[in-house]
Amino acid sequence: MLAGQHHVTDIESPLMVVLWRVAAGVFLPLVPTMAVFGNVLVIMSVFRERSLQTVTNMLIVSLAVSDFMVAIGVMSFGVYYEWNDFKWGLGSFFCHVYQALDVACSTASILNLLAISLDRYIAIGHPISYAQYGARGGRAMISITIVWGVSVAVALPLLLGVNPMEENDLQECELANPYFNMISSIFSFFIPCIAMIILYTIIFRRLRQRERARSLRQAQRSENDKISSALLGGAQIARQMGKHFKNRTDQILLEISFQTSSFPTMSESSEDASTISPMINSFNNFLPKKTPYPSTSIPAIPECGSMPNLTIIERPEAEKEKEISIMDLRDTVEMLDDKYSSAILTSFQTSRSFGEELEEILPFIDGSNSVKHSREQLHTTRSNTSTTRLLDVKPELRSISVPSIQDEKKLSQKSNDLPFSHQNGTHKQKLLPNPGILMKSKSTTLLKTNGYMDTDSLNRNSHKKSLADLLANDEFSFSDSMRVYKNRLFKSLSRATSGWNKPRPSRHMVKKATKQMRREHKATVTLAVVLAVFLFCWLPFFVLHLSNSICLIIDENSACVGFLPLYLATWLGYLNSSLNPLIYTVFDQRFRNAFRNILSCGIFKKR
């Protein structure tokens, strides 16, 4: 590519000539040797290591092949030309081959870097599409074919006689056609160079935006952790409240049994016989045998659910005393309800500070639309309960429910999992509607807040199950309720996004794209360094080469650039072919391991 080699007389000092010959004779052969050795390592590493066989690395192999050909077919002629005192003695054919190889391989290096830049742009800008369609060997082969086809097309005119050698001066082999030099420099270097700079600018801007989005997601994650803590805290308080009500109710029932001199016996239900028999035996140890009296049941408590049946046997003369005990029991339960309802409302008020918009999406955080409304509902229910009177109790056999061991687990699980809500003032009662109405069933009703439970939140969509259906289903569990609310939460959040109606990629594809994106980020940094080094090495030569061609077009007998600057810039460009393998070794761990395995004949890999 030297376009001014006839200016060899620029070096006039004999001392400078000697120093130049010594330096050129020692150091110039090292450049093609390093280029051949390093690029062969790159090619072998990609074909030996399966983990390196990616689209990007296939393009890197194409770049290594072009650098290898520069070292073999261009630098070797350059060393010979310099050692022969810049006199070409191989004839016009080899001169044209030398020039064509120089132009073709240099153009291929530039276009390979452009293809790599396009590959980086697709991988960073559209990671899911790249993981689906871009990471295929066929696309890499198409890119490589286009690169080498254009490079050969650019260099082909040199073989067709565009730059003929003068018959009277066969000792010089130079690119003397200024028009070809200018056009080839613009289309082979400057246009691809500008395109690569634009692409890498967009790539790094995308990476910066992605980093900012990652920081925002981390901030939102901390806020979500607070919300999760509030949810867990509210669920824990609800479980503690239910457990306390259950234990306290059982304790009060036992106290009533002792106060009325009654003792529990087995009911008609055979399922509970094995459960309550130890309790009966314990009472029989303390109480003497008596003649059975007509019995009646204790009215159901509105603040707790029904439980497996136990029968309370009592004397007729204890009816009045029993009614007084029942009133004390109701007052005690109301006091406990007041205490723990205030506590749970305070906890819900704290959790609301993290986002009141979750009321509709997650109704299990707070059952009402506001804390104030919950308190109003609490006072209204309490006043309604206080005005309820006991029905006339007749001395006949009735039952009251106490949880069995088997049902207690189901009751605890369902009561912890099901949401309680109140919306638009509509109430749906799932417990005993009246203290005088008697229940003889298994424990399917639950402890609840303020005696009411709303199922409207589960009936918003026609395809959802109602709360009654869920209660009737014995297999209803915590995972069922969480699945309902996760689906509702996802739909509510997806409507807020712009592309909620687009088909979502599979989870496997997202994980693959995420992993691919991390790897592409590292590869992008490495290839950005390769591009920077390439520009540093080749930009001086092409600037001087274009300037010299413009000067020759203006005046055929004068050149703007001297021989020595152009000669040094040419070898600086050749040096780039030796630096690329060093860049891969420094910045890419996989290439470094592959180089070490090749140089050690696989010893490190076997270990």
UniProtKB/Swiss-Prot annotation:
Residues 413-424 have a biased composition (Polar residues). One of its GO terms (cellular component) is synaptic vesicle membrane. Disulfide bonds join C95-C173. It is found in: Cell membrane. Residues 1-23, 80-96, 163-182, 545-558 are extracellular. The keyword Thylakoid does not apply. Keywords: Cell membrane, Disulfide bond, G-protein coupled receptor, Membrane, Receptor, Transducer, Transmembrane, Transmembrane helix. Residues 402-435 are annotated as: Disordered. Belongs to the G-protein coupled receptor 1 family. This is Dopamine receptor 3. It comes from Caenorhabditis elegans. The lineage of its organism: Eukaryota, Metazoa, Ecdysozoa, Nematoda, Chromadorea. The gene is dop-3.
